[in-house]
Amino acid sequence: MAHLLDGHDGKCQNLHGHTYKLQVEISGDLYESGAKKAMVIDFSDLKSIVKKTILDPMDHAFIYDQTSERESQIAALLQKLNSKTFGVPFRTTAEEMARFIFNRLKHDEQLSISAIRLWETPTSFCEYQE
């Protein structure tokens, strides 16, 4: 994903990308019988949900703050060039992105999300939970 932080006083004001790593923590009761006995969720199901809900729309996209005129102008140019964009109504800090991802996933009735950990670099992450 690529983004920028309009108005930031450092290098993050420039368009740049990250190879994010997403960690999803779930909780819930174990299935008592059937193919999923002793599981909260089959990890392949979890992976499919995360792919559909988060990765497919956001991977290799310019993630931009729709409330920023500058970022919206950049997104419009990229859209004219048939580049992938994904608009959100907030500044695209790792903290806000973690909250956004948590909230998108918590609406899936198959999941009971406990926390999201979003790694922006190999040594820096933020976590969101409710």
Question: What are the roles of these predicted feature ranges?
Answer:
Residues 1-130:
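Charge-rich, low-complexity N-terminal segments
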